[in-house]
Regions:
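Phosphate/dinucleotide-binding and metal-coordinating scaffold of catalytic cores
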Residues: 1-248, 252-254, 266-360
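Conserved protein-kinase catalytic-loop segment immediately C-terminal to the catalytic Asp
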Residues: 259, 264-266
Length: 360
């Protein structure tokens, strides 16, 4: 049996020591010593699960093929080379006797690895020099990568491909952003860009070395969507208002993909203290990206549903109140536009949702 020991850190603060134990039949993990219980990652249920979450990547099914091509065959090798860095927080891992420190591995301070970014975006391998990269720990089903531009870090995310109605998802991010701003709802700013000849949505990284991000799912370990239960679990009026705003935006934009994994919560990295909900993000499946012009729009909207299975009419009933109706008045006469051929369809969608809600 072989044993390799590592230390998990938050910035330059040691949090715990763990080991990877390997024999000819299996690979096991053990937590050997907790050094700072307060700073144990909030999304850590067990050490194996946490380490594996640091290399989920967009194309998770191909991740082992990627490692094999680059000569990284064991999890111990992956940890040593990449240090399990992420843009979600300031946690990282090094060998127990390693001299590395946070300044040398931080994705906020160091160049982002182009080889890994290219693979995360288009599954192509251009070179073999890999280091720590936040692309490893960025989940989701669409091609995406992190890029540093003019001193800022941005997430670039492409749409689907291969079908007549594919590729509209990046535009949905921008439409939803504009509608949210019209409603006075806090949202990450998205724009349309081009990367390697592909249309992508572009947004600035919302985290930094002071503030990290954890999903509602990972913080509370709740996996099945139930928006009524979510509203009833609100711990304050501020939280409830946030959730109502979120569901209102989802109603207006017909967002079919609001799940607990894309409801973000801000954490103070240095203390592990939960601060509150983040800006809203990840709306690429809102604004009916797969609708085609020969379909009946009203029927199409009535036939799709929110992530917890309820119709959008029922979603509105869940949040219907004077506050919501006052917000919706801001959309009366509003013609959202991003200069795209889908402008008319999205405007008509908003009008239908307004009419269904306000009965005019």
């Amino acid at each position: 049996m072989s044993k390799k020991s590592f230390i998990l850190l938050n910035g330059n603060i040691s949090v715990l020591i763990f080991s990877v134990l390997r024999d000819e039949f299996s690979v096991n993990y053990s937590v050997d010593k907790i050094l700072n219980r307060v700073l144990v990652p909030r999304d850590m249920q067990e050490i194996r699960q946490w380490v594996e979450s640091r290399y989920i990547m967009s194309y998770r099914n191909d991740i082992r093929v990627f490692f094999d091509i680059l000569g990284v065959s064991r999890i111990e090798d992956f940890i040593e080379i990449t240090n399990c860095v992420s843009l979600k927080d300031t946690y990282w891992v090094k060998g127990l006797n390693s001299k590395k420190h946070w300044d040398t591995v931080s994705p906020y301070r160091n160049p982002l690895n182009k080889v890994i970014a290219d693979y995360s975006f288009n599954r192509r391998i251009n070179g073999k020099n890999i280091t720590g990269s936040p692309d490893f720990s960025t989940d989701g089903n669409f091609p995406k990568c992190w890029k540093r531009m003019n001193g800022e870090i941005y997430l670039l995310k492409a749409g689907s491909s291969g079908a007549i109605n594919s590729g509209n998802e990046p535009y949905s991010e921008v439409y939803a952003c504009k509608i949210a701003r019209r409603l006075g709802i806090g949202v990450v700013d998205y724009t349309i860009s081009d990367y390697k000849g592909v249309t992508v949505s572009k947004c600035k990284c919302m985290t930094n070395e002071k503030f990290g991000l954890i999903s509602y799912r990972d913080l509370y370990r709740v996996y099945e969507c139930d928006f009524e239960r979510l509203l009833n679990s609100s711990k304050s009026d501020v939280d409830k208002k946030f959730l109502i705003d979120m569901l209102l935006l989802d109603y207006v934009t017909c967002n079919v993909d609001r799940h607990y994994g894309n409801i973000g919560i801000i954490v103070e990295n240095s203390t592990n203290r939960v601060l509150g909900y983040s800006l809203l993000y990840d709306h690429n499946l809102s604004c009916i990206p797969y609708y085609m012009k020969d379909e009946d729009l009203e029927f199409y909207i009535s036939d799709i549903c929110a992530k917890d299975g309820r119709s959008f009419k029922d979603l509105f009933k869940l949040i219907d109140c004077t506050y919501v109706r006052h917000k919706l008045q801001k959309l009366v006469g509003y013609n959202v536009s991003i200069g795209c051929k889908r402008d008319r369809v999205v405007r008509d969608m908003v009008k239908i949702q307004l009419r269904n809600a306000l009965k005019y």
